Amino acid sequence: MHRRTFLATGAATALGGPALAQTDRQRTLRFVPYADLSIFDPIWTTADITRDHGYLIYDTLYGTDAELQPQPQLAEGHLWEQGGRICTVTLRDGTTFHDGEPIRARDCVASLRRWMAVAPMGQTIEALLDELTALDDRRLRFRLKRSFPL
């Protein structure tokens, strides 16, 4: 091994080690957006910065993984019934808002209705719905006008 290769390898190894002396404060992620955030509500704008902020702050029932497959986030899971016309989504237990209040199915229904009233994709989904209701604190039901292939 050449001297320069040996020194470069040693330096790279030393630099790649963990920062053992970090405090909790140093582990805080600081996010610097590329633009000023003027609208906090992702429903009322199509600005990328607002969308990015929304994904960092708000949760969704489902998200997508690295292979773009749907994965439960706020949802624990779902059950399809009546040949794909009814989907019952169960929320994860113990989820809360920032103030400690539990997230209930009726909160999700209200958020979805608000989204469906404004967003073009929401309006498309609303056109497919016969009914959207909260069955109890942890379950909400989507009743579709016809079976929907997923």
Residue ranges and their predicted role:
Residues T90, T124-L150:
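Surface-exposed binding/hinge segments that line
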Residues T5-A21:
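N-terminal export signals
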Residues Q26-A35, I86-T88:
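Short, well-ordered beta-strand elements
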Residues Y34-L37, A66, G83-G84, R92-G94, ...:
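Solvent-exposed coil/turn segments that connect beta secondary-structure elements
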Residues V32-Q82, R113, T124-I125:
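N-terminal lobe/hinge region of extracytoplasmic solute-binding protein
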